[in-house]
């Protein structure tokens, strides 16, 4: 099942350009099929779904210092930002990004996905990658 997350513009740009290949989160969607599902991204501060990416796998990690040592380049955020987020968690999941693209026409989260607010972590959606592929930039 596809999911929706919210990210700031600079991280969306890094994901689509290939500079950021790992998204780290406190959890992962258990009903997500890496072979066919995708993650839609809402730009933080807006109602617009502007991009999507596919995930190759989810990896569990428990030590933020080791995560930073091993994956700092792929994570694509400064150390202080990472540690401000990471110190609050006991478990971390690395979402390995396989491919990403901007949507040609941004989608309104309410009209297209039926969401009234931007998700804090992630939410499931019935909207599919096939729908989005017609809107690729």
Short names for language-model regions:
Residues 1-137:
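Structured alpha/beta reader/binder surfaces that contact nucleic acids or chromatin modification marks
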């Amino acid at each position: 099942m596809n999911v929706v997350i919210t990210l700031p513009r600079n991280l969306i740009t890094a994901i689509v350009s290939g500079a950021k290949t790992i998204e780290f989160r406190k959890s992962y969607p258990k009903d997500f099929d890496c072979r066919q599902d995708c993650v839609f991204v809402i730009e933080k501060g807006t109602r617009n779904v502007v991009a999507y990416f596919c995930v190759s796998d989810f990896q569990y990690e428990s030590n933020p210092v080791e995560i930073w040592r091993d994956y700092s380049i792929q994570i694509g955020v400064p150390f202080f930002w990472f540690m401000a987020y990471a110190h609050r968690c006991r478990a971390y999941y690395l979402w390995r990004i396989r491919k990403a693209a901007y949507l040609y026409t941004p989608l309104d989260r309410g009209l297209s996905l039926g969401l009234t607010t931007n998700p804090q972590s992630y939410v499931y959606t019935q909207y599919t990658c096939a729908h989005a592929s017609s809107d690729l930039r």
